[in-house]
């Protein structure tokens, strides 16, 4: 009897030792991943901030420096990070720990934190894709927006969003309360700014909207942007020392013009005069993620026009977005550059989902495409403004996309052969897209609780 008790006690100690070892292993895996990510981000941030770049960008050379030489490698690295995240989440679940991780690499990095409001700037460590080095105002002070008005676009009142975004120094901009901001003229941002609307219900609506022009390092997170109108032909301040005459603003929700290191994340965008997100005039190093797009015609334009060859260096990641109700086309519409479209949910379109001209490279991975009932609109892709069969040389790839309701993707170029050497590693399975994109759009965040 004593021998049996001794054996039972010994077995319990062995099991306890194994359990503790597993806990420490899983914790170390997660901590090592986070430490590595933060170290790389910090080193990149220090390097970037010590560069001789001015607040506003000028010329092709500076923007070229922000484009990577091997975009397929970046897509490969993104997939590796997704795989690492999945391994760590699986390890925690096997040990019986609760995990809020759902395979969305960006959200899994920060959304589980109940103290997100005390660690707001950790968001800047969580970017992925071509815009992963968009640090925004991480190295600056907080600026609290207390006033929803926009009465004076030349001499904006302190406490307003316009006053915040034109400042020269890095700023992390947050909001004291819920507010609806009706901008009289386009909101012209300055470099190294984060607009972080978590914890408040903030709408930019029924007026002008956001312009990111010839600047670098901007994060826009958590806004509702809708019903943007065409404005302009007035003087608008763009910095404390400069105000200038502005021509017509088209009425885009977010216009990114000649800028780099930009991250547009977790916004709800709809029903604007022109585009919802336009990326043009040599912009590069952009990530557009976790957004919810609805009720709009021309959703996303990536590339100025066919003759604007500076856009050949454009590199954009479009990830984890939900392209939803009432959309017609351009999700996105691409020119010249390299575009990684990964794990998005396409539940509605009336004409086509992904289109392009001027020989863009489009790498589509793990997306879910649900075609409309209209039999003439089942094709996901659309080549525009092409001569003869020249489009057959364009590299448009589809890898493990989920095509439902008769949807079909027409590959071309290297994509037509399915050559795995030219493709990055698989993204999350398209069957997981519903979970990954379930929280796309502006989140509901309360202090002391994870954001949902």
UniProtKB/Swiss-Prot annotation:
Entry's cofactor comment: Binds 1 Ca(2+) ion. Required for its activity.
Biological process according to GO: pectin catabolic process
Membrane-spanning ranges: none
Domain of life: Eukaryota
Molecular function as annotated in GO: metal ion binding; pectate lyase activity
Homology family: Belongs to the polysaccharide lyase 1 family.
Name of this chain's protein: Probable pectate lyase 9
Species annotation: Arabidopsis thaliana
Classification lineage: Eukaryota, Viridiplantae, Streptophyta, Embryophyta, Tracheophyta
């Amino acid at each position: 009897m004593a021998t049996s008790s001794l054996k039972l006690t010994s077995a319990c100690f062995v099991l306890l030792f194994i359990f503790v070892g597993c806990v420490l292993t899983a914790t170390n895996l997660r901590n090592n991943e986070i430490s590595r990510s933060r170290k790389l981000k910090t080193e990149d941030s220090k390097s970037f901030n010590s560069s001789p770049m001015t607040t506003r960008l000028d010329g092709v050379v500076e923007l070229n420096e922000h484009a990577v030489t091997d975009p397929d490698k970046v897509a490969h690295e993104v997939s590796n990070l997704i795989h690492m995240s999945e391994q760590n989440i699986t390890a925690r679940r096997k040990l019986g720990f609760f995990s809020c991780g759902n395979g969305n690499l960006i959200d899994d990095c920060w959304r589980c934190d109940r103290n997100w409001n005390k660690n707001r700037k950790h968001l800047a460590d969580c970017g992925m894709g071509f815009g992963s080095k968009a640090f925004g105002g991480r190295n600056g002070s907080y600026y609290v927006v207390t006033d929803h008005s926009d009465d004076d676009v030349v001499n904006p009142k302190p406490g307003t969003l316009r006053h915040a975004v034109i400042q020269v120094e890095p700023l992390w901009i947050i909001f004291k309360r819920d507010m609806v901001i009706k901008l009289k003229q386009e909101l012209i941002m300055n470099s190294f700014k984060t607009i972080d609307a978590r914890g408040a219900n903030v709408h930019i609506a029924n007026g002008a909207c956001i312009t990111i022009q010839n600047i670098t390092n901007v994060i826009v997170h958590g806004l509702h942007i809708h019903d943007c109108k065409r404005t302009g032909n007035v003087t608008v301040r763009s910095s404390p020392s400069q105000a200038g005459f502005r021509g017509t603003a088209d009425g885009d929700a977010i216009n990114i013009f000649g800028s780099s290191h930009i991250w547009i994340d977790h916004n709800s965008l709809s029903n604007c005069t022109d585009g919802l997100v336009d990326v043009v005039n040599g912009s590069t190093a952009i990530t557009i993620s976790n957004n919810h797009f609805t009720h709009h015609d021309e959703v996303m334009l990536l590339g100025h026009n066919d003759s604007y060859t500076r856009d050949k260096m454009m590199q954009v990641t479009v990830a984890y977005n939900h392209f939803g109700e009432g959309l017609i086309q351009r999700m996105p519409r691409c020119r010249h550059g390299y575009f990684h479209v990964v794990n998005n949910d396409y539940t509605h379109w009336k004409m086509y989902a992904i289109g392009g001209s001027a020989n863009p490279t489009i790498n589509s991975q793990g997306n879910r495409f649900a075609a409309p009932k209209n039999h003439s609109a089942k094709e996901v892709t659309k080549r525009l403004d092409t001569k003869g069969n020249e489009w057959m040389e364009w590299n448009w790839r589809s890898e493990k996309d989920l095509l439902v309701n008769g949807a079909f993707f027409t590959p071309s170029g290297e994509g037509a052969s399915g050559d795995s050497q030219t493709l990055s590693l698989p993204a999350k399975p398209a069957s997981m897209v519903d979970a990954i994109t379930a929280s796309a759009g502006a989140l509901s965040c309360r202090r002391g609780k994870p954001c949902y």
